[in-house]
C-alpha cells in the first residue's frame, strides 16, 4: 500500500476520538484507589463490603464484555460506543449524588458495563479504520488514553484531597461533593470527559469494514474515500474484505470452532487472562496500600508517579511498536517485569535484615511499571483487535475480553488475601512466575503481526491447524 495515499490526519482523528473511550476506561478503573478509605469510613463498611465496593465495577465490566461483541456486530461499532458513553455519564453523575452505599454500588456497576463495552469496541473500531503500516500505533492510542485516564484519576484524587483540606464553598452541594465527602467529587469528575466522548461520536463514521460485512459496500466506499487519496486503495480494501467473506458463513459459534480460528480464540483468551496475573492490577488497585506498607509517607503521590511513568512509557511504546514489532516488545518488557518483581520481593523479604531504603522498592516498582507499559499493556489490545477474522472479530474479542475481566476481578479479590497469606514477598514472586507461560505462548503461537493487513493475519490463522 502506498504510504502517500493514506490521509493520516483523518485516520488519526478517528483513532483519537475512539481512544477517548480508553481515557474513560482508565479514569473509571483507577479513581477507585483514592476513594476506598473515605467510602469505607463514610458508610462504615465491613471488609466484605469494602471488597464488594472495589469489585462491583469489575462485575459490571464482565457483563459489558459478555455482550459487547454481539452488540457491536449487530448494531455497529459506533452505536455501541454511544451506549458506553451514556453509561459512563449516568455512572459518574449517580456516584456524585448517591444517597446510600447500595446505590453507589449500582452506579459503579453501570460504569463497569460501560468499561466492558468500550474495552472491546473502541480498539476494534480503531483497528478497522487504520491501515496496516500504522495500525499498531493507532490502536496503541487507546492504551495511551487508558494511561492518561489513570494519571488523570491519580491527579484528581491527589488535588481534590488537597482542596478538601484547605477550601470551603458557599454552595452546600459543592461543599458536600468537594470538601465534606470529597470521594463524590473524585468519582463525579468523570462526567466531563464522558459528555465530551458522547458529543465527539456524532462526528465520526461507522467502521467501513463492518459496513462491508453487512453488505453496505457503497456506504463503506464513501467513507474509505476519506481515508485514501487514490481510488484503487479504496477498492483494494473493499475487495480484500469481500474476498475473505466469500468463503465464510454467518457469524455463529460454529465458525469460532473452525480450524485455526479456534486456536486464535484460545490463544487470545490465554494472553488476556494470564496478563492479569502478572501484577499489573495489583499495582493499579492496591498501589497506595502497598506503598504505605513499604513505609512511604505519601502513597497517593507515589501513585501519581506510577501514572506519569505509565503514561510517558506508553507514548514511547506507541512510537516504536510498528518498527520494533509486537513480539520483541513483549520479550524485552516481560523480562524486565520478572527482574523488577523479584527485586520488589527481595525488598519485602530482607528490608529489616539489610535495612534497605524504601526508595530501593520504589525504583524497582517504577521500573516494573515502565516494563509493563512498554510491553503487555501496549501490545495486548493491539493483538486482540487484529488477530481475528472480520466476520467474528466482535464475538472473539468479547470472549477474550470476558477472560481478561474475569482475571482482573480474581486478581482484585485475591490480592489482599495473597498479601496477607503469601506475604508481599511471596505475592510478587508469584507474579514473576506467571510471566513465564505468557512468554511461552507469545513465542510459540503468535505471529509477528506488524506490517500485516487484517486480512493477511486472518489467512495466517485459517492456514494453521
What are the functions of these language-model segments?
Residues 1-218, 223-227, 245-465:
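Alpha-helical transmembrane bundle of multi-pass membrane proteins
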Residues 231-245:
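Short, well-structured alpha-helical segments
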Amino acid at each position: 500500500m502506498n504510504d502517500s495515499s493514506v490521509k493520516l490526519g483523518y485516520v488519526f482523528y478517528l483513532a483519537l476520538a475512539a481512544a477517548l473511550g480508553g481515557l474513560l476506561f482508565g479514569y473509571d478503573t483507577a479513581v477507585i484507589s483514592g476513594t476506598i478509605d473515605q467510602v469505607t469510613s463514610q458508610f462504615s463498611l465491613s471488609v466484605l463490603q469494602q471488597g464488594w465496593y472495589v469489585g462491583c465495577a469489575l462485575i459490571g465490566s464482565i457483563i459489558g464484555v459478555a455482550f459487547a461483541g454481539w452488540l457491536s456486530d449487530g448494531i455497529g461499532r459506533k452505536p455501541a460506543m454511544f451506549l458506553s458513553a451514556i453509561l459512563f455519564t449516568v455512572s459518574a453523575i449517580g456516584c456524585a449524588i448517591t444517597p446510600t452505599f447500595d446505590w453507589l454500588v449500582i452506579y459503579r456497576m453501570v460504569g463497569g458495563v460501560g468499561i466492558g463495552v468500550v474495552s472491546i469496541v473502541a480498539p476494534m473500531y480503531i483497528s478497522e479504520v487504520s491501515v496496516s503500516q500504522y495500525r499498531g500505533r493507532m490502536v496503541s492510542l487507546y492504551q495511551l488514553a487508558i494511561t492518561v485516564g489513570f494519571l488523570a484519576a491519580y491527579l484528581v484524587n491527589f488535588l481534590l484531597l488537597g482542596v478538601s483540606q484547605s477550601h470551603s464553598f458557599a454552595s452546600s452541594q459543592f461543599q458536600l461533593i468537594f470538601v465534606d465527602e470529597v470521594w463524590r467529587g473524585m468519582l463525579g469528575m468523570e462526567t466531563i470527559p464522558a459528555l465530551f466522548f458522547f458529543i465527539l461520536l456524532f462526528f465520526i463514521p461507522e467502521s467501513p469494514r463492518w459496513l462491508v460485512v453487512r453488505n453496505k459496500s457503497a456506504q463503506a466506499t464513501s467513507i474509505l474515500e476519506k481515508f485514501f487519496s487514490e481510488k484503487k486503495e479504496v477498492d483494494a480494501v473493499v475487495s480484500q474484505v469481500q474476498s475473505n467473506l466469500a468463503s465464510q458463513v454467518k457469524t455463529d459459534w460454529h465458525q469460532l470452532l473452525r480450524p485455526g480460528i479456534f486456536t486464535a480464540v484460545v490463544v487470545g483468551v490465554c494472553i488476556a487472562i494470564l496478563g492479569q496475573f502478572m501484577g499489573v492490577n495489583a499495582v493499579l488497585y492496591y498501589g497506595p496500600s502497598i506503598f504505605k506498607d513499604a513505609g512511604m509517607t505519601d502513597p497517593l503521590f507515589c501513585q501519581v508517579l506510577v501514572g506519569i511513568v505509565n503514561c510517558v512509557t506508553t507514548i514511547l511504546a506507541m512510537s516504536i511498536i510498528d518498527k520494533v514489532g509486537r513480539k520483541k516488545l513483549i520479550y524485552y518488557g516481560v523480562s524486565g517485569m520478572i527482574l523488577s518483581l523479584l527485586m520488589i520481593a527481595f525488598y519485602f523479604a530482607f528490608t529489616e535484615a539489610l535495612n534497605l531504603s524504601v526508595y530501593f522498592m520504589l525504583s524497582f516498582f517504577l521500573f516494573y511499571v515502565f516494563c509493563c507499559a512498554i510491553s503487555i499493556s501496549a501490545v495486548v489490545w493491539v493483538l486482540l483487535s487484529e488477530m481475528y477474522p472480520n466476520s467474528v472479530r466482535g464475538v472473539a474479542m468479547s470472549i477474550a475480553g470476558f477472560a481478561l475481566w474475569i482475571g482482573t476481578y480474581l486478581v482484585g479479590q485475591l490480592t489482599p488475601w495473597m498479601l496477607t497469606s503469601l506475604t508481599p514477598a511471596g505475592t510478587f514472586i508469584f507474579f514473576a512466575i506467571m510471566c513465564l507461560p505468557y512468554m511461552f505462548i507469545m513465542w510459540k503461537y503468535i505471529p509477528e503481526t506488524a506490517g500485516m493487513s487484517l486480512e493477511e493475519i486472518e489467512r495466517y490463522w485459517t492456514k494453521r491447524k
